[in-house]
Amino acid sequence: MMPTVIILAGGLGTRLRSVTHDHIPKPMVPVSYQGENYPFMSFLLSHLYGQGIRKIILCVDHLAEQIVSYFGDGHRYGMQITYDNAGPVLTAARVKQAMEKTDDYNVIIHCGDVFHPLNIDRFLQNFNQHPENLMQIAVHKKLRSEHTKPNLVIGKKGQVFDYKKKNAGENRLVLDTGVLIVRRGILSYISDSPEESLTENLYPELIKKNVVGTYESETAFYDVGTPAEYSRFCNYVEKVGIRPLLEQKSSANGVA
């Protein structure tokens, strides 16, 4: 059975204000498909549906009513969508509250402004081969872009040694793509503080414990958090023709 996916979709989208004008939440920015506009989130959900994912928890806050109004409970799309509105708290605090809504032992966490069409079966298989890890981060192997920079130091076997380092020494620098899978054991590392962040608090703590692995992919990914990357994703959709989430229909977008 496929795990629940927690999507972090509550950010203010400050870098994308020239597109949203603070009138729409970042996951709902319009993307054209066959002459009609669909929200970015519908393309992400379509990919997840095509990979067998059926249960989604959307962590919302900023202009949340627009997301809830559009997707509802997910029934008409063949999915089960629930919502968690923790208010203006940081990402680890959001994840902790959302994980309390599911009994799944493994949970996928996905940034709500990222489209990375991974093969979820392979992603899970790799995680299951490393039961010692509490977290596995999807990383890009060879990305070289003016808009993104490598931020994880990993060893030969994919174990994460450091975060936000510019020099890897004997190791390699790769880019965290905003998709990860975790075991419930991470909950013991997240305090009840609303100021708990995934990257600033949880990542360093788990890296020190040597329980963070990676899944490497060469599949192109898109972060619509900036106008340049948003435009790049729109061009990708136009060129490749990937489908948004449509009522009772699925889309198996390109996978790694």
Name every feature range the model reports, one short phrase each.
Residues 4, 54-56, 80, 134-135, ...:
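Residues at the starts of beta-strands that form the adenosine-phosphate
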Residues 68-69, 74-156:
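Conserved beta-loop-beta/alpha segment of the NTase-like Rossmann-fold superfamily
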Residues 40-43, 94-97, 202:
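Well-ordered alpha-helical segments embedded in enzymatic catalytic cores
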Residues 16, 67-71, 190, 233:
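Hydrophobic packing residues within well-ordered alpha-helices of enzyme cores
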